[in-house]
Amino acid sequence: MAASVARVLKAAGGRQLLLMVARRRPVLRQPFLLMPRKFWGTSALRSEDQKQPPFSSTSAHAGTPEHAEEQYQQQQPPPRYTDQAGEESEGYESEEQLQQRILSAALQFVPDFGWSADAIAEGAKSLDMSAAAAGMFEDGGSELVLHFVTQCNSQLTELLEEEQKLVQLGTSEKKPTTQFLRDAVEARLRMHIPYIEQWPQALGMLLLPRNIPSSLKLLTAMVDDIWHYAGDQSTDVSWYTRRAVLTGIYNTTELVMLQDSSPDFEDTWKFLENRISEAMTMGTSVKQVASTGEAVIQGLMGAAVTLKNLTGLNQRR
């Protein structure tokens, strides 16, 4: 039903019309009212009991209804608007902000509707918007997945930054690099747990040709942040080696996690710890860098094949 409404709206006016349907309708709560004439009479009577200031053009202007009207407007708070639920907010939000709010609200419906336009429509309805707001997203499912990955990366960066501040303040000890990398990757992958049953579908979308550039950008940015907060200051070829290796470790651990039925994914974290320990003993030769890069590409291709086999499974084995 939501998709049909969205198509009709698109035909009628396109993206802007969808925005008008989804966006909260502003209702001016405090309309300007001209002050009654008796106000001026009362003010004049009161002013007679006070010392009159010297006459000037400014004071003459101040006594006019036009000036009082201007002062009244300046003293009023900014117009406030209400949505369908009667909640107030000031001003408008941009199209991007509106989309981000809808996508964030849609995440709670992923377990029931998957990474789909239906989940987005439910998210819009939870914000008291029209389900037709799902039509704002040309590739709903993929945009929802990319939004989630971006959100998770931001949360990880905040965690790592907070940990760094505690170390700088002396309230926490700096972790060995091996432990730091393991904890960072584990923290990031744990963010998938609420959607673990739907994650094969998400990975399949991330590996679609049209989404690979965005997926790789998010992945490499996340890995770079982890190494940055780990204290990596290398400027030689090892800079590339370390990031390529950690990228491969993250991808393979993510696939292991999808098939892990152990309590709290214990087998996954053990696998991760072993791979991190092995990686820290690697050399930094150019030959190893090249082979590592090839391994990452092969890993992505292998992931696509694995996901093809995993797609459709509703439960982990």
Swiss-Prot record:
Pathway(s) per entry: Cofactor biosynthesis; ubiquinone biosynthesis
Residue spans of biased composition, Acidic residues class: 85-96
Transit peptide: 1-46
Keyword Mitochondrion found: yes
GO cellular component terms given for this protein: mitochondrion
Mitochondrion in keyword set: yes
TM segment ranges: none
Annotated keywords: Lipid-binding, Mitochondrion, Transit peptide, Ubiquinone biosynthesis
Example of a GO MF term: isoprenoid binding
Localization terms from the record: Mitochondrion
GO terms under biological process: ubiquinone biosynthetic process
Region listing for Disordered, in residue ranges: 45-97
Binding positions (a 1,2-diacylglycero-3-phosphoethanolamine): R243
Primary location recorded for the protein, binned into one broad class: mitochondrion
Domain comment quoted from the record: Structurally similar to the bacterial FadR protein (fatty acid metabolism regulator protein).
The protein's assembly and partners: Homodimer. Heterodimer; two heterodimers of COQ7:COQ9 come together on the same side of the lipid pseudo-bilayer and form a curved tetramer with a hydrophobic surface suitable for membrane interaction. These two tetramers assemble into a soluble octamer with a pseudo-bilayer of lipids captured within. Interacts with COQ7; this interaction allows ubiquinone (CoQ) isoprene intermediates presentation to COQ7 and facilitates the COQ7-mediated hydroxylase step.
Function: Membrane-associated protein that warps the membrane surface to access and bind aromatic isoprenes with high specificity, including ubiquinone (CoQ) isoprene intermediates and presents them directly to COQ7, therefore facilitating the COQ7-mediated hydroxylase step. Participates in the biosynthesis of coenzyme Q, also named ubiquinone, an essential lipid-soluble electron transporter for aerobic cellular respiration.
Xref: PANTHER family: UBIQUINONE BIOSYNTHESIS PROTEIN COQ9, MITOCHONDRIAL
Membership in a protein family: Belongs to the COQ9 family.
Name of this chain's protein: Ubiquinone biosynthesis protein COQ9, mitochondrial
Organism: Xenopus tropicalis (Western clawed frog)
Lineage: Eukaryota, Metazoa, Chordata, Craniata, Vertebrata
